[in-house]
Design a protein with these regions (language model features):
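Alpha/beta-hydrolase-fold enzymes
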Residues: 2-115
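Short, conserved loop/helix-junction motifs that constitute active-site signature segments
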Residues: 5-7, 149-153, 180-185
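Active-site nucleophile elbow and catalytic-triad environment of alpha/beta-hydrolase enzymes
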Residues: 124-149
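Short beta-strand/loop motif that positions the catalytic acidic residue
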Residues: 152-153, 158-161, 165
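Conserved alpha/beta-hydrolase "acid-adjacent" motif
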Residues: 166-175
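Catalytic histidine-centered segment of alpha/beta-hydrolase-like enzymes
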Residues: 167, 190-210
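C-terminal alpha-helix
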Residues: 214-225
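Intrinsically disordered, polybasic Lys/Arg-rich low-complexity tracts
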Residues: 225-273
Length: 273
């Protein structure tokens, strides 16, 4: 949008995403970099079975995604479920409900389109096309366009990272600031959430208390900036009619007032007499 000269959003908030996956590589990054593109296509892509909606589609199945998430921290998940069992015995309803709510969201996964998944692996985690300035995407006309974050100027940028994020490592999301070189420093903000993992910046107490208030304030600041920039234009427009009125009044005042000739007035007076 910015490269085409179109209007861009007031603000852009990027959270826990691998803008530059080379920084602080995690287990996810290492897997993507150490396996070939063909390996992913041959080992994690399957077709939807015939008795399910979308039968025959090639996908990265949700159950494999879930298994991968759990395998990253098996001890932590085992302890969480053990604590859940103890809380049930103690009758700690609040802790039990918090556990259920978290895992209801954590376990909710969807099959991912194969082409989308494989392209993401190659573009983001293997070839780093965005940071190398070599990423092309198709526009609505089917024509390739280069992605140029350096063309963004009027959109404020906020990035959010979790201190303990083991999926998108430290600095991977903040790298967006280095790419968006034309955004003024006053319109940039970075937040690192202390003690938060990847999911912590999106949900739960840390999201409610540490992340959401700042994101909300950042968006409101962008709206206020727009209103402030629009104010002079509004004032000049409202002043225009008043200027026209003043000009009209000036012309009226300058126009000579019609007066009767003294001779004609005297003649009329004589006739009346």
């Amino acid at each position: 949008m910015a490269s085409r000269g179109e209007k861009t959003p007031l603000t852009m908030t990027m959270m826990g995403g691998p803008i530059d996956a080379r920084k602080s590589p995690t287990a996810v990054n290492n897997l993507a970099m150490n396996k070939s593109h063909n390996w992913f296509e041959n080992n994690v892509i399957f077709r939807v079975p015939g008795n399910f909606p979308g039968a025959g589609r090639r996908v990265y199945p949700g159950f494999m995604q879930h298994a991968g998430f759990v395998a990253m921290n098996p001890d932590r998940h085992a302890k969480s479920h053990y604590d859940y069992f103890k809380d049930l015995i103690k009758g700690d309803g609040a802790s039990v409900e918090a556990h259920r709510k978290f895992y209801d969201e954590y376990n909710a996964v969807l099959d991912m389109d194969a082409n989308y998944y494989l392209e993401t692996i190659r573009t983001v985690f293997q070839e780093f096309k965005l940071v190398h300035g070599s990423w092309d995407v198709l526009n609505l006309k089917g024509q390739p366009e280069r992605v140029r974050p350096q063309d963004i100027r009027t959109t404020a940028l906020m990035t959010v990272e979790g201190e303990l994020d083991d999926i998108s490592g430290s600095g991977q999301t903040a790298a967006a600031h280095d790419l968006c070189t034309q955004i003024d420093k006053s319109m940039k903000q970075h937040l690192e959430v202390e003690g938060a993992g990847h999911y912590g910046i999106f949900s739960g107490r840390r999201w409610r208390d540490a992340v959401y208030p700042q994101v909300k304030a950042f968006i409101a600041k962008g709206q206020a900036r727009l209103e402030q920039e629009s104010a002079p234009a509004k004032r000049s427009k409202s002043a225009a009619p008043a200027t026209k009125s003043v000009r009209a009044a000036t012309k009226t005042a300058a126009r000579p007032t019609a007066s009767r000739s003294p001779r004609k007035s005297a003649a009329r007076s004589a006739k009346m007499g």
